[in-house]
Amino acid sequence: QSRVGKTPEELASELNSRPFYHGTGTDNLVAEDVNPYMTQPDSLFGMGFYTTDSPKIAKGYAKSRARGGGTPTIFRTDFNLKRVLDAEIPAPSEVREAITKSMTGWEPMVQARQMISKTIDDPSATTEQIWKAIRNAVGEISVSDEIPKHEFLDHFYEMALNIQRAGYDAITHTGGKRTGSSPHTVVIL
């Protein structure tokens, strides 16, 4: 279904109306233990609980996550979302402000903010483009200044919290475009 022109509330309603799936390498995951901030920061949109509307894609993730001896498991989830941020449309001003607020205080993050200023200040830039620019800037700073990437985690965590505080409880984008697989809807909590 097309997301073009939908409000964050309309998008949430549409996504709430169908099941989503999460593929993992563990069979003992329970909803109460899911903490999006204890996940991999190197994922496309950083830390979060990634789901897809494609059971086939979730199965692939489950198999890859279980390679180290785990149990490939697919969990179905149903949402009760209120407002969803579409990462493929121009980032709303409150999202830009939430991200910018997280890039202050610590000199390497201030430097990263300067590096991405052209992108984040461009009103046509999508959340996806801004996030990619941040990841690239942090990667460059990490190498040039010999700062381990995990040193930036608190700031990425703060970005996610600030986006939540701006009123969004999930992010969505079209999966498969980067990997050449079939298009599918991804929702990140």
Task: List each language-model region with its residue ranges.
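Active-site and NAD+-binding cores of ADP-ribose-processing enzymes
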Residues: 1-55, 59-189
